[in-house]
Amino acid sequence: MANQLKVGIIGAGAMGLLYAANFANISELTLFTRRKEQSDLLNQKGLSLKDNSELKNIHIQATVITDAEKLSEQELLIIAVKQYSLKTILPLLRSIPERVPLLFIQNGAAHLDSMPLLGNKRTILLGISEHGAGREDDTTVIWRGHGRTKYSIYQGELNEAVIKILDSNPDFPVEKHASYLDIINEKLFINAVINPLTAVLQVQNGKLLENKEWHELLKTIVKEIQTVLPVENALEKVEVICQVTATNFSSMALDRMNNRMTEIDGIVLPILEKGESLPTLHALYHLIKGLEGESDV
């Protein structure tokens, strides 16, 4: 362990647990949790990863997010909290030594506005995750869909050790791209179509193609978003994701089904702010905000 890179993951929801499971064997990993109860359970029981019929139990080290000493020891920090939780941990991120690179893997684009607040001297990577994951409990994550992590350098530069660790697990591919805006906008576009629709309808992604009326609605939303966020072959890309994740519920659908706050403000609001000619997307946005209000989340 002494020669391995120290990698920390902030956030122990579905994505944080999935990334922890996949980085545990290639790094000296620490998972930072909001609740001490969860970090204690992870230290006692380990992390269980369910992948189809396979179940792995992985020994990991966990501690609370307020463990400043442990945070400052890391050589790479992956920020895996939900979009709406990011602002609450910004003061903590600002206190981390500037030599520690930060990799953000949030949904949406609202977090881009927060990057300048972290200063211009640290290395910041902006990424997206194509994986599907669901947290069963505090120590168990279900790998619902395999994909890639794509990232680009927002500012700064990477040392060889970090590049090597990101590229060292063929079962969990990480790709470097030239433009962070390109990868974020493409993921944002896809999420802005699939997530709110499935959240309102409370259906799996594949139903958006199977049901003729819902498919027409999907195509309408794609056309609207294209007017303010052009993405090449957008409809095809959205439909492919619906096909390959046909049996999955989107993260926003799962949030609604569990009466949790959604990431609607991070995913849809940045698009709505680009223009007014988006009536269907506006309607979906207000439907979900209204549902959140009814659930008092």
From Swiss-Prot:
Coiled coil: none annotated. It holds the Pfam family ApbA. It catalyses: (R)-pantoate + NADP(+) = 2-dehydropantoate + NADPH + H(+). InterPro entries: 6-PGluconate_DH-like_C_sf, 6PGD_dom2, ApbA, Ketopantoate_reductase, KPA_reductase, KPR_N, NAD(P)-bd_dom_sf. Belongs to the ketopantoate reductase family. GO terms for biological process: pantothenate biosynthetic process. This is 2-dehydropantoate 2-reductase. GO terms for molecular function: 2-dehydropantoate 2-reductase activity; NADP binding. It is found in: Cytoplasm.
